[in-house]
Amino acid sequence: MSLRPGLLLAAGLAATAPAATRDRDPLSEFTGRVAGAPVRCLNADRAGSLQAVDDRTLIYRESSRRIWRNDLPDVCPGLDDDSILVFEVFGGGPCKGDTFRAVRRGSGIPGPMCRLGSFVPYVKVKP
């Protein structure tokens, strides 16, 4: 099977999340959740929903019950909650070690290449 690089775009928080979600700190959503075992990859259909929180953290909201967090192995200069993420994916979906660039909305100029870490699921604890 030949692996050809593909590009995936992930719009920033302002374009994808409901207003109530945009108005609060995304990291506060981890309160009351328990971290699961890290995984290397997400399904391809989840990549478009990855959201930058700061220069080291991406999140994906799978459902009201499960949120995925990706702590990048290094700081990604220029990455923030208004970034458009452009991924270079080899295979089915974003995986640990895959690279991406952050593009400032309106500028079109990509930032430096950054790498993904492992994806950690956080599941809401049932009362």
Predicted regions: what is each one?
Residues 1-7:
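Bacterial N-terminal signal peptides that target proteins for export
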Residues 11, 33-34, 50-52, 62, ...:
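A generic structural signal for short, solvent-exposed coil/turn residues
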Residues 20-69:
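N-terminal secretory signal peptides
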Residues 68-77:
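Amphipathic, hydrophobic secondary-structure cores in small proteins
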Residues 76-127:
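Helix-rich interaction surfaces within compact, conserved domain-sized segments
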